[in-house]
Amino acid sequence: MVCKHFGSCGSCALYNQNYTQQLQLKEQRVSELLSPFYTGELELFDSPDSRYRARAEFRIWHESERCDYAMGNIEKKGAVTIEECPKVIEPIEKRMWKLLEKINASQEVLKQRLFAVEFLATTTDECLVTMLYHRKLDEAWSEEAKMLERELNCRVMGRSRKQKVILSDEFVTETLEIDGKEFTYVQYESGFTQPNPAVNVKMIEWAIWQAKKVGYGDFLESYCGLGNFTLPLSHYFDNVLATEISKRSIHAALQNCELNAVENITFARLASEEMTEALNGVREFSRLKGIDLKSYDFSTVLVDPPRAGLDEGTIELISNIDNIIYISCNPETLARDLETLIKTHTVMEAALFDQFPHTEHVESGVFLQKK
């Protein structure tokens, strides 16, 4: 990927290395962190070099009468205006510059106190644009935004403090082919989604390969989000219990279950710590009413925690389950958690998923089996 803003825009910190070099550095970093626990081959899953990101946020920089997109400066001092962003997927690219033209052509209605624009797009050319303001949005804004929807063939939302204006919908619908099957996902504007669709598919398929090695019992998932892993993996287990703290994500997960005609998943709105308390019989939760936890016989658990990794209670809980699929967005906390998990389990497989090319961020996964 080549970008005229390499060296000034802070979005791509590894701009001075080609993609192969970047991947080698990430492989070295993850391999070193995992070396006390795993001596096998680290499987690498690369990304497209450009046009890979389906979610993006840009600041709006006001200069005289004009607005421009801006990103944080690479030196973390101020911002730099941008004229291109080759990492966003085509459904964003083809709309973002037309949108900027419309904003600048507007008689203040669209540009007044606009401070950021967010894009959420799909590989099937759907796109949701969220415009963020430091002012209350009125009917005049709604009318111009409706014109944007028609002209850009996308969905437009407006947000300001304690205000959300939905003109048509607040979601997009993605369809991905995973392990030879099509899966449809409703993705909401404020919900978490994996930003790199191509690598996301590889990541889910890797988890499926591990699940196929088990081939029995029930499946437990923590941090399930909108069902990204849950739906495809549900085909390889008898019953599934998936937990997530976000109301919006649980709502999306239930919709996605229905869209994909999956009937063996039960979703529960619980934090990871609460899931541990419930399964250990420490606390009862009204949110689990009608769910017989004792009826499950979990053979496999998948965890995909935030950067902080797993809490001690969750580690203790999953250490009692035969097979663990651990997806991590922070290899340092993954290594920390493995120090405990290898007391009961052996790391059988490890993988690196390059969700974030041109940055130092890296996603990884390990598959563990009970000793």
Swiss-Prot record:
Enzyme class: transferase
Keyword Transmembrane helix: no
Name of the protein in question: tRNA/tmRNA (uracil-C(5))-methyltransferase
EC number: 2.1.1.-, 2.1.1.35
A Pfam match: tRNA_U5-meth_tr
GO molecular function, one term: rRNA binding
PANTHER family with a match to the protein in the record: TRNA/TMRNA (URACIL-C(5))-METHYLTRANSFERASE, TRNA_TMRNA (URACIL-C(5))-METHYLTRANSFERASE
Catalysis performed (reactions): uridine(54) in tRNA + S-adenosyl-L-methionine = 5-methyluridine(54) in tRNA + S-adenosyl-L-homocysteine + H(+); uridine(341) in tmRNA + S-adenosyl-L-methionine = 5-methyluridine(341) in tmRNA + S-adenosyl-L-homocysteine + H(+)
GO biological process: methylation; RNA modification; tRNA processing
Catalytic residues (positions): C329 (nucleophile), E363 (proton acceptor)
Family affiliation: Belongs to the class I-like SAM-binding methyltransferase superfamily. RNA M5U methyltransferase family. TrmA subfamily.
Function as written in the Swiss-Prot or TrEMBL entry: Dual-specificity methyltransferase that catalyzes the formation of 5-methyluridine at position 54 (m5U54) in all tRNAs, and that of position 341 (m5U341) in tmRNA (transfer-mRNA).
Binding positions (S-adenosyl-L-methionine): Q194, Y223, N228, E244, D304
Gene from which the chain derives: trmA
Alphabetical keyword list: Methyltransferase, S-adenosyl-L-methionine, Transferase, tRNA processing
KW S-adenosyl-L-methionine (keyword) present: yes
Gene3D superfamilies registered for this protein in UniProt: 2.40.50.1070, Vaccinia Virus protein VP39
Organism: Sulfurovum sp. (strain NBC37-1)
InterPro entries in alphabetical order: MeTrfase_TrmA_AS (IPR030390), MeTrfase_TrmA_CS (IPR030391), SAM-dependent_MTases_sf (IPR029063), TrmA_MeTrfase (IPR011869), U5_MeTrfase_fam (IPR010280)
GO cellular component: cytosol
